[in-house]
Amino acid sequence: MARMYYDADANLDLLADKTVAIIGYGSQGHAHALNLKDSGINVVVGLYPGSKSRQKAEDAGLKVMNVADAASAADWIMILLPDEVQKAVYQEDIEPNLREGKVLSFAHGFNIHFGQIVPPETVDVIMVAPKGPGHLVRRTYEQGEGVPCLFAVYQDASGQARDRAMAYAKGIGGTRAGILETSFREETETDLFGEQVVLCGGLSALIKSGFETLVAAGYQPELAYFECLHEVKLIVDLIVEGGLAKMRDSISNTAEYGDLTRGPRIVTDETRAEMKQILREIQSGQFAREFVLENQSGKPGFTAMRRQEAEHPIEEVGKDLRAMFSWLKDK
């Protein structure tokens, strides 16, 4: 059984006299920066010239610098940029400023695990990955709570890398909820698998296929939207709250019987074989190479797929229906 670590297990004093540079001020960046600041840590934010996030960071009372200056000034660097831009920013602005004894941090292991970023042997390389979006990381911290985190050590130059990772997790509120130790490989491969097979790829394909099946059979698109997309949140909320058991305990007997007897016909042996193939593509680096090359070539296929998905009938139906949802209008 995996062990969870909490506030008493981590020593925030390891960050007390350090300057932490948060590179990027998006969803995770703003949460990490503000939570660390409120934990009494000296924080600077590294942004590229002309960044639209600069004013937001300054309005929050944070010192903003360009990325190279932030990396130079900091003892601790946390890269919170999209995976596809990290390598270029690292090579241009961060690597020249990585002196011995510094800490290089990530919230996802992609670039380290797949060799896009190769750090010098003289720095600690760690990961602290909150298992929730940035707005939740920030909101729960302000409420005196936190979001569970994963933490890992890739390189321990100082002999303190593990303790440092735990201290950082405490600084952003993770140890209030509990943090779980992993490795860069395990986090990266399981994260990609979950995204592709279940959370994003699998769920999106399932929703669209269900919608298309009902519409093709002559049912109103609006009803198909409600049954195959809108109600997903109702079910997922129950699962998150208490697992599959709570969900099944909360739905009707009719729904539960249909779940248990028909669900296995959707995820077949062929589906499971495809899941294993997708996992092999992740483990071998095939997916990573494909993604890197796609971005290096200007994302032509990615852009075309985005355009095609945006034109799917479920998007237009959903747009019209959501306009009538009064509870969404204030968001």
Curated annotation (Swiss-Prot):
Entry binding sites for Mg(2+) 1: D191, E195
Pfam families reported in the protein's UniProt record: KARI_C, KARI_N
GO process terms (BP): isoleucine biosynthetic process; L-valine biosynthetic process
Entry keywords, A to Z: Amino-acid biosynthesis, Branched-chain amino acid biosynthesis, Magnesium, Metal-binding, NADP, Oxidoreductase
Binding site residues for Mg(2+) 2: D191, E227, E231
Domain KARI N-terminal Rossmann positions: 2-182
EC number: 1.1.1.86
Catalytic reaction(s) noted: (2R)-2,3-dihydroxy-3-methylbutanoate + NADP(+) = (2S)-2-acetolactate + NADPH + H(+); (2R,3R)-2,3-dihydroxy-3-methylpentanoate + NADP(+) = (S)-2-ethyl-2-hydroxy-3-oxobutanoate + NADPH + H(+)
Domain of life the protein comes from: Bacteria
Pathway as given in its UniProt record: Amino-acid biosynthesis; L-isoleucine biosynthesis; L-isoleucine from 2-oxobutanoate: step 2/4; Amino-acid biosynthesis; L-valine biosynthesis; L-valine from pyruvate: step 2/4
Chain sites annotated for binding substrate: S252
Active site: H108
Cofactor(s) needed by this chain: Mg(2+)
One GO CC term on file: cytosol
MF-aspect GO terms: ketol-acid reductoisomerase activity; magnesium ion binding; NADP binding
The keyword ATP-binding is assigned to this record: no
Function: Involved in the biosynthesis of branched-chain amino acids (BCAA). Catalyzes an alkyl-migration followed by a ketol-acid reduction of (S)-2-acetolactate (S2AL) to yield (R)-2,3-dihydroxy-isovalerate. In the isomerase reaction, S2AL is rearranged via a Mg-dependent methyl migration to produce 3-hydroxy-3-methyl-2-ketobutyrate (HMKB). In the reductase reaction, this 2-ketoacid undergoes a metal-dependent reduction by NADPH to yield (R)-2,3-dihydroxy-isovalerate.
Name of protein: Ketol-acid reductoisomerase (NADP(+))
Natural source organism: Crocosphaera subtropica (strain ATCC 51142 / BH68)
Gene behind this protein: ilvC
